[in-house]
């Protein structure tokens, strides 16, 4: 197999872990890559950190105007526009690649050539780099409905940095799928990339996702989060009911299962937002705000009650 050029992109806003993130890329055992760092007009000194490196594979850009958390996917897609590699990954400024990440991806591509998307096994770490948990193992090959089913049943977690996607495919299909706050953007992007040919998964640990208090998924207005969920679930319903998608007997079984649990999964997501909001803003009165505004928020009394009950354990 010919040498593969990888594009590793970092849409950067936070500086705290950026040095470690860059070092993890430069320390790869496979060295044929470009590192694209896009400063989202951050108030933190991103440029000072990047300027410490003279590696010619690093390409630094800065937005004239901040995309912000709500429109963060715009930043992902701007990174994509700069990419020249055959495959691209988009990682957070606080995440890390394991040393053999790209080497393992070359092995996976060689074993399963011609796909539009590949997946890395991920460790979830805390702010100090301590292991919190390991992402679940996945079958080496699977189709779109198997992927969706695992997420709807809450048996999987995944992040944008888990995925390696063929650059030409992504550019030809509108880039990363945009939802406010990127809620569901990584999932839908992966599903669409796997729609025709499926995905190849590695069960070698290749990526580290860092959970911390400044992660986008922990921020944002509840109205925006609910808007994101509604848009994502609407698109997901269309995808699940797409009769044109190729599917064998197993995939057809997963498709039927996805159709049967979609509404329940959507309700669980809404209740999760309600629960987090009540827990963070006051269990004693916040549930009343939800009841008063339930029509505007398009949630039910049952959603609020179950969200409140869940918040008691937080």
PLM region descriptions:
Residues 8, 142-224:
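Conserved nucleotide-sugar donor-binding catalytic segment
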